[in-house]
């Protein structure tokens, strides 16, 4: 029970910090609950992409995929928010599946844990691309982790 309370408190703190860091205030003033809902949506999207892209790659494998999304959000060549990075055409093919939509609405606990860990301390701040069949023809190869090849 204590662990669930700690996890809840940590997720609220992370949501508040993410809200503060995001551009959510740029359009119109938001209440904390509206901001928290927006950030929880991002957490669920990150958990879903981690599950569907790397759910069989262990915690670090999922974290590398989450890092890819977070690094893209900060990179000027990509959209500046989690939703648009994940749904950008021809990037994460899993978004077109029913399984992805299920993962968004019912995220796995281990995937949420991976997101929260990644938001607390990012495992890698360089990765922008990954591929399951070898290094892509674009970007600079960085490393292979289990079945995925990561590049910047």
Go through the PLM ranges and name each one:
Residues 27-152:
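Bacterial extracytoplasmic/cell-wall-associated proteins, especially those involved in peptidoglycan
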């Amino acid at each position: 029970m204590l662990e669930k309370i700690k996890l809840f408190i940590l997720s609220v703190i992370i949501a508040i910090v993410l809200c503060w860091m995001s551009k959510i205030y740029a359009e119109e003033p938001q209440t904390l609950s509206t901001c928290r809902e927006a950030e929880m949506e991002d957490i669920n999207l990150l958990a879903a992409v981690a599950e569907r892209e790397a759910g069989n790659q262990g915690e670090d494998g999922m974290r590398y995929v989450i890092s890819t999304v977070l690094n893209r959000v900060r990179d000027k060549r990509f959209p500046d928010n989690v939703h648009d990075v994940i749904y950008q055409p021809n990037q994460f093919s899993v978004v077109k599946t029913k399984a992805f939509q299920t993962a968004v609405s019912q995220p796995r606990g281990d995937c949420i844990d991976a997101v929260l860990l990644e938001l607390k301390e990012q495992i890698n701040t360089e990765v922008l691309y990954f591929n399951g069949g070898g290094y892509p023809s674009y970007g600079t190869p960085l490393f292979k982790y289990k079945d995925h090849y990561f590049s910047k």
